[in-house]
């Protein structure tokens, strides 16, 4: 008896094999970039120190107390805590080693897995070519690749957000209640990672209502209402317990400030207080990144010609340069546009806008494509508000916009190249294939992408290692930069009574960075050298070690405490 195979089964098998090969290539690419950057990280980001401490507190304290006292949302620290279980068994070592490795692995793994929903989202929006190249380019562009390797919450946030968008797109096409409920659950999880995750649910709700008002006018409201109810209920079910525990929408300083009407105050009005010191008299290294808002949580130098603060990670408010409301608005628009351009590697935003215009007819149906556009617009509005209130815009906050925009950019390039090559113009012989253009963009971006993370902070790492070998638990560390105190082991001190009373405190160690561009925008500036010397302080370590102390970039002073001079 002859067995005749079903052609549709062969076609389905071929499609899945092709998808599998493309996904394998994406996973290998993402893994290679993550591993390279993890192996070439001098220090973790300052925000990651807070996340590591957060995860450590979840392990050692009551969760309700920890959630209320920390400013960041808990899902990424919970992911770090979960990752620390196998890391502790495999790697071992101190809490510093375990938690830092766990934070880097949690962030890196989420960044790798991101290629899967990105591929399928692009496949749903256009085709698998668009999904493949959008995911590949996003992994290779400097801002996204480096943030996803830096032990920050963005990787987990982007992974969950992309899954939510994929579920929303499919739910709009099928009308499935399960899809909207799943999207709501993912929106709640995205909110538990970063507060702007709630915008996903808002974008889906706007698209649902818009479709009823402008497309399906004859459709009864009951179906739309049930889909909205499923979306909102799922979001509330996931996000509600955290909101109830903290008794508010968010503990983040910036998020709370966004709900107020005041424009940001000058940085000169923000001074350090005794809150930056812990019970041992040393700098609380997990506080500075969060307690007074992100305006002071990064470093940078000023372009004196324009009076605008610039750093590797953000654009800062120009103190004293703009005072009126129109000035605030224009500066905020400039800052947002600059960070978006940087996120798109300065060129990819152009085909993204072309793609939006070319495929604008799709938006008339108020479907999944509209969800993506509304989400990007809502994120832009939120970042404008951040710029107006907090006085800064960070590149990592525009990543969800870059992620969504790359689909339109890739689709536009395919459309333009195919149209040119099919035309009768002589230019078609000079027009390269779209894949070659994408490869050229990747090759240009990779050198910047693969630069070591925070290589300019090697000195702080060295100071921290020196402190770890020479200080006693009772000695104080005054470190406005966080890294030296972190690598000295002060991040994970157990706050037990009498823990530091077994030995007598002798010195207050003060980290002083001699580079002016590395001292700007910190919560508490380094004490002037003259004051340290007058207090009896002496330089006990300098970096680089091979140069004379007068030529050193970083000085470590040991100042005798009262009664020990």
Q: What are the residue ranges of the model-derived segments?
A:
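Hydrophobic/aromatic-rich transmembrane helices and adjacent perimembrane loops
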Residues: 147-148, 154, 190-194, 199, ...
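Catalytic lumenal/periplasmic loop and adjoining terminal transmembrane helix
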Residues: 35-42, 243-253, 279, 289, ...
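Short helix- or helix-capping micro-motifs
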Residues: 27-30, 134-142, 166, 187-191
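Signature aromatic-anchored transmembrane alpha helix within multi-pass, membrane-resident enzymes
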Residues: 3, 24-27, 202-206, 228-237, ...
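Membrane-interface transmembrane helices that cradle and orient dolichyl/undecaprenyl
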Residues: 4-12, 123-125, 129, 164-180, ...
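Short acidic/glycine- and proline-prone juxtamembrane loop motifs at membrane-interface regions
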Residues: 44-46, 72, 143-157
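Hydrophobic, aromatic-rich transmembrane alpha-helices
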Residues: 116-118, 298, 305, 331, ...
């Amino acid at each position: 008896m002859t067995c005749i195979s079903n052609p549709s089964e062969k076609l389905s098998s071929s499609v899945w094999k092709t998808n599998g090969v493309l996904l394998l290539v994406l996973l290998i690419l993402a893994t290679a970039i993550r591993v390279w950057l993890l192996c070439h990280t001098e220090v973790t980001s300052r925000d990651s120190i807070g996340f590591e401490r957060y995860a450590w507190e979840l392990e050692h304290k009551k969760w309700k107390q920890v959630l209320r006292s920390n400013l960041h949302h808990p899902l990424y620290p919970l992911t770090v805590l979960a990752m620390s279980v196998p890391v502790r068994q495999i790697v071992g070592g101190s809490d510093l080693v375990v938690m830092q490795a766990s934070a880097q692995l949690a962030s890196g793994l989420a960044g790798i897995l991101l290629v899967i929903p990105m591929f399928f989202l692009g496949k749903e929006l256009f085709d698998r070519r668009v999904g493949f190249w959008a995911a590949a380019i996003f992994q290779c562009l400097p801002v996204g690749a480096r943030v996803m390797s830096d032990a920050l919450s963005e990787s987990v946030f982007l992974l969950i957000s992309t899954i939510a968008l994929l579920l929303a797109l499919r739910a709009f096409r099928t009308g499935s209640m399960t899809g909207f409920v799943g999207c709501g659950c993912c929106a709640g999880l995205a909110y538990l990672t970063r507060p702007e995750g709630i915008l996903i649910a808002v974008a889906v709700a706007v698209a649902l209502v818009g479709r009823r008002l402008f497309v399906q006018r004859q459709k009864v409201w009951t179906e739309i209402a049930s889909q909205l109810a499923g979306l909102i209920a799922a979001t509330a079910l996931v996000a509600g317990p955290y909101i109830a525990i903290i008794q508010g929408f968010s503990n983040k300083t910036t998020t709370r400030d966004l709900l107020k009407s005041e424009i940001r105050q000058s940085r000169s009005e923000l001074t350090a207080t005794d809150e930056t010191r812990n019970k041992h008299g040393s700098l609380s290294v997990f506080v500075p990144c969060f307690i007074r808002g992100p305006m002071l949580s990064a470093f940078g130098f000023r372009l004196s010609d324009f009076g605008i603060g610039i750093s590797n990670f953000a654009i800062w408010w120009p103190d004293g340069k703009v005072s009126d409301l129109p000035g605030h608005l224009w500066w905020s628009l400039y800052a947002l546009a600059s960070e978006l351009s940087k996120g798109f590697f300065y060129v990819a935003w152009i085909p993204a806008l072309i793609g939006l215009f070319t495929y604008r007819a799709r938006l008339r149906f108020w479907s999944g494509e509209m969800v993506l556009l509304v989400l990007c617009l809502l994120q832009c509005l939120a970042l404008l508000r951040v710029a107006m209130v907090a006085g800064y815009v960070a590149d990592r906050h525009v990543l969800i916009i870059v992620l969504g925009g790359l689909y339109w950019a890739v689709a536009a390039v395919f459309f333009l190249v195919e149209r040119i090559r099919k035309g009768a113009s002589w230019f078609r012989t000079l027009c390269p294939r779209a894949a070659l253009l994408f490869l050229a963009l990747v090759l240009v971006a990779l050198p910047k992408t693969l630069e070591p993370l925070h290589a300019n902070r090697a000195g702080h790492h060295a100071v921290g290692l020196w402190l770890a070998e020479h200080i006693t638990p009772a000695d104080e560390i005054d470190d406005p930069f966080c890294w030296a105190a972190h690598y000295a082991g002060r991040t994970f001190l157990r706050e037990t009574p009498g823990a530091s009373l077994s030995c007598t405190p002798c010195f207050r160690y003060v980290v002083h960075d001699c580079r002016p561009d590395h001292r700007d925008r910190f919560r508490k500036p380094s004490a002037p050298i003259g004051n340290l010397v007058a207090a009896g302080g002496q330089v006990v370590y300098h970096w680089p070690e091979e140069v004379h102390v007068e030529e050193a970039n970083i000085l470590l002073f040991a100042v005798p405490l009262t009664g020990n001079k």
